[in-house]
Amino acid sequence: MIFYESNFTQYLDSINRINIHKKNTELYQLFRNKPYHIIIHGPSGIGKYTQSLKFISMFSNSHLKYQKKFTITNDKSKYIFKLSDVHIEIDFLTLGCNSKNIWNEVFSNILNITHSNQYSLFFIICKNFQFIHNELHESFYSYMQTFMVNHVKFYFVINTNNISGININIRNASYILSLSKPPESIIKKISSQTPF
């Protein structure tokens, strides 16, 4: 698997070639009928982001081939977010200490995008959730409770290295999926098949 793929389909191609978390495929099929908030946790580099894309890809009409960048600029910084036909990605590592204001602006724009494009379902992938600022963390559950706005159902896919610091309300509202490091034999097999 290439470490930093440049688009969604490259991640999906890599997981279709070598999927070290095959047990999740059946679980994702169950979610197809009834999507739910999900927390995917495990050590860095284990494939949380790739598993997130695999999960939401079955809801995408374009199979995540549609990719755009969405930019928010404030007086200090410029923030770039990836957007597909079914999701947006927010990296909490890049939001910093002004994250609550940025989040409110992003969420407002998400509502506009989904309403204008008449989506019925939309996912928000929250990368590096372990870096969420305390002020935003305290109010984050209220966003998760907003399951439906303007006839659009919103679901959060949270990627984090650990769940111990996540608010109990967020954990209770989500399915928790734990990813573990594969055996050494599988890592060697993957290494031998991966072009560098």
Task: Kindly label every feature range from the protein language model.
Residues 1-129, 138-139, 149-158, 168-170:
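P-loop/Walker A NTP-binding region and its immediately flanking N-terminal helices
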Residues 28-32, 187-194:
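Alpha-helix C-terminal capping segments
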Residues 96-98, 184-187:
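A short acidic, often aromatic-flanked loop/helix-cap motif at beta-alpha or helix-coil junctions
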Residues 128-132, 163:
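Conserved Walker B
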Residues 154, 167-185:
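A short helix-turn-beta junction within AAA+ P-loop NTPase domains corresponding to the substrate/partner-engaging
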Residues 173, 177, 189-196:
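Conserved AAA+ ATPase "sensor/coupling" helix adjacent to the nucleotide-binding pocket
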